[in-house]
């Protein structure tokens, strides 16, 4: 029996704040249009997804406000850290995202950035913002589940 090829998925950056501030309705994988120094910085894990979001403009999905720090060994041709980056999605996927975000309070946020077979990918999620009481409620549920797991483990 042939061996399965080893998966190359390697998480480089995660947006943990997004899972706290939003309830994720659906997720989708997208490629990105990058320059040479940007991919080198991504491989060095010099990425911040915290304030990022995706905007649909003129039939294109654009990743905005994501910081990819300058490449340390770069020269005068280094990239702008806050440059807007085009996401590579099929037309149907873009139309689906555009339709979902027409509702009030729905946005698209980057959840995770990783390498897949040498290409940088970003996992984006269609999300609905949580209220403060929803955040507290989800924290309580998580604590209760942790207590239950502890009690079952110590049995």
Curated annotation (Swiss-Prot):
Protein name from the UniProt record: SsrA-binding protein
Q: What does this protein do?
A: Required for rescue of stalled ribosomes mediated by trans-translation. Binds to transfer-messenger RNA (tmRNA), required for stable association of tmRNA with ribosomes. tmRNA and SmpB together mimic tRNA shape, replacing the anticodon stem-loop with SmpB. tmRNA is encoded by the ssrA gene; the 2 termini fold to resemble tRNA(Ala) and it encodes a 'tag peptide', a short internal open reading frame. During trans-translation Ala-aminoacylated tmRNA acts like a tRNA, entering the A-site of stalled ribosomes, displacing the stalled mRNA.
The protein's location, in the record's own words, is: Cytoplasm
The source organism is: Pediococcus pentosaceus (strain ATCC 25745 / CCUG 21536 / LMG 10740 / 183-1w)
> Which keywords are on file for this protein?
Cytoplasm, RNA-binding
Q: Give the region (Disordered) as residue ranges.
A: 134-155
InterPro entries, per database record: SmpB, SsrA-bd_prot, SsrA-bd_prot_CS
Entry's family note = Belongs to the SmpB family.
| GO molecular function terms listed in the Swiss-Prot or TrEMBL record | RNA binding
- Please name the GO terms of the biological process aspect recorded for this protein, alphabetically: trans-translation
According to the UniProt record, one GO cellular component term is: cytosol
- Entries under Gene3D superfamilies matching the protein: 2.40.280.10
Source organism, top-level taxon: Bacteria
